Amino acid sequence: MKSTALVYRRRFFVLALMISCAASAIYAQNEPILVPDVVDYAKLVPILPDAPQAWTADKPEGSTEDVGGFRITNVHRDYHKGEGDKAPTAAISILDSVANPDYVSATTAAWNNNSETSEGYSKSVTIDGNPGFEAFEKESKHATLWVMVANRYFLQIELQNQDPRELQEWIKRVDLKKLATIK
C-alpha cells in the first residue's frame, strides 16, 4: 500500500510540475519581451585602434542592422604590414551581442575547452578580467583571440603570418575599459 501511495504522490508531483510549467509558459507569452538595444555602430568605431608603426590600416567599417527580429551591431578594421600573400595581417572586429544573451552564454561556455596538437592549440584565457579564447593553426600561421567584454561585446582579433604571441600586443591596443562603458 505504501508503494502505491508513493507512486500516486510522484505522479501528482509530476502532474503539478507540468501544469505549473505550462501555466508559466502561457503567462510568459502575454508578457512583452524586454531586449536591451544594441549601441549604434558609430559609438564602437573609435575603439578600433590606429595602425601600429610600419603598418597600414583600412578605413573602419560598421553597421547596425535588423536581423530576424533583433538588432545587431558590428564594427571591423583590417591592418596590413607590407604586400603579398605572406605579409602579416591583422583584423579586429567588435560585435554587440546584448540582444542575444543565449548566444553569449553558449559561446562563452564552449570556451572552457583546451587542446593542443601538432597542428596547433586552443585554450581559454582571461584578459583584464574578461573571459576569452585563443586558437592557433601552425601550418597556416593563423591566430585568433576572442574576448567577451562587459558580457555584451565579442571582441575578435585575427592574425595571419604572425607569431600567436602577437595577439597579446594587439589586444593591448584596444581600450577594453572604455569599450565596457559604452552603452
What is each model feature region?
Residues Q29-L34, K81, S115-K183:
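A short, solvent-exposed beta-edge/loop patch
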Residues K2-V14:
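Bacterial N-terminal signal peptides that target proteins for export
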Residues V14, N74-H76, T89, T144, ...:
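Broad gene-expression machinery/nucleic-acid interaction feature
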Residues S24-A28:
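Sec/Tat signal peptide C-region and signal peptidase I cleavage site
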Residues F13-A23:
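Bacterial N-terminal signal peptides
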Residues E31-S140:
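Short, solvent-exposed recognition patches
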